């Protein structure tokens, strides 16, 4: 049976900062355990391709398949935990989910007041970053806390508000998913077409661009829907060699991203790419 290279792929995917985070926290373990895990980590990290036989030899674990498998599995789970914790501390999207998880635990332990504090933290982050799917769970947990509150009057006053809040974010999420599907359709057409200038290919692109959601910008009900609306049209009309329309949509995409400050929420790469596409169209 071919040895799994999952651990190798995970280590190779790690950034310098993630590796430092792992090393610092691993050194806090007992000396023997820390030495084993770091030795295996270093042995795998030094490889260009995964060669389990040479790694076992380097670790002095030739013929100890079961023990080596346990060490690999422990290191993999440990790395995944460290990477997750690192991103929970550095990325707001992860923090929102972590706060919601904490709120769920506190609510299950019948500590609604404490749970509410973490729901508010999660909600603030998710709303700021337009995390619609996260907000569905956050609003639901918030409604549960109010529902089980002894303050019946307060629950009665907020019942409609919570329902409408949940309904609005579900609608935004579904609307965004429709635009994502259209984006996937366009990408699939591009990937499976040898000659995009061929009349048949142009007809396929045109058919996608004639979808009702792509004909009216007011149909895009969320920030990400607006981004997809302009992205799809910008690319589509570029393929159809309609540079005026392509430029218009790409310029609008830049304006949307900049006005919503999405470039500060982990989208700097997308923003720079959009600026490049706009420049190419303009030239």
Give residue ranges: language-model regions.
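Tandem amphipathic alpha-helical repeat scaffolds
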Residues: 102-108, 140-149, 181-198, 227-242, ...
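Flexible helix-coil transition and linker loops at the boundaries of alpha-helical arrays
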Residues: 86-90, 125-129, 170-174, 211-223, ...
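Helix-turn-helix repeat elements of alpha-solenoid scaffolds
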Residues: 73-77, 110-120, 153-163, 194-213, ...
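Short helix-adjacent coil turns
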Residues: 17, 63, 106-117, 126-133, ...
């Amino acid at each position: 049976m071919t040895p799994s290279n999952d651990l190798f792929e995970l280590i190779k995917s790690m950034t310098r900062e993630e590796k430092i985070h792992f090393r610092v926290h691993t050194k806090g373990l007992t000396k023997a355990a820390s030495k084993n895990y770091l030795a295996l980590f270093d042995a795998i990290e030094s490889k260009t391709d995964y060669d389990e036989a040479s790694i076992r030899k380097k670790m002095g674990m030739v013929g100890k398949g079961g023990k080596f498998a346990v060490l690999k599995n422990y290191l993999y789970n440990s790395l995944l935990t460290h990477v997750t914790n690192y991103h929970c501390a550095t990325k707001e999207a992860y923090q929102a989910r972590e706060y919601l998880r904490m709120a769920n635990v506190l609510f299950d332990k019948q500590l609604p007041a404490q749970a509410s504090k973490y729901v508010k933290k999660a909600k603030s982050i998710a709303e700021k970053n337009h995390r619609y799917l996260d907000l569905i769970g956050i609003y639901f947990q918030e409604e549960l806390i109010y529902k089980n509150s002894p303050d019946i009057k307060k629950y009665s006053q907020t019942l409609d508000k919570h329902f409408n809040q949940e309904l609005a974010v579900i609608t935004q999420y579904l609307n965004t998913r429709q635009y994502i599907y259209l984006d996937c359709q366009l990408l699939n057409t591009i990937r499976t077409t040898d000659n995009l200038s061929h009349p048949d290919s142009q007809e396929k692109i045109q058919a996608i661009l004639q979808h009702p959601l792509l004909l009216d910008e007011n149909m895009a009900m969320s920030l990400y829907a607006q981004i997809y609306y302009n992205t799809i049209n910008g690319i589509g009309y570029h393929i159809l060699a309609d540079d005026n329309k392509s430029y218009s949509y790409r310029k609008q995409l830049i304006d949307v991203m900049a006005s919503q400050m999405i470039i500060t929420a982990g989208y700097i790469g997308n923003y720079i790419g959009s600026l490049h596409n706009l420049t190419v169209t303009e030239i």
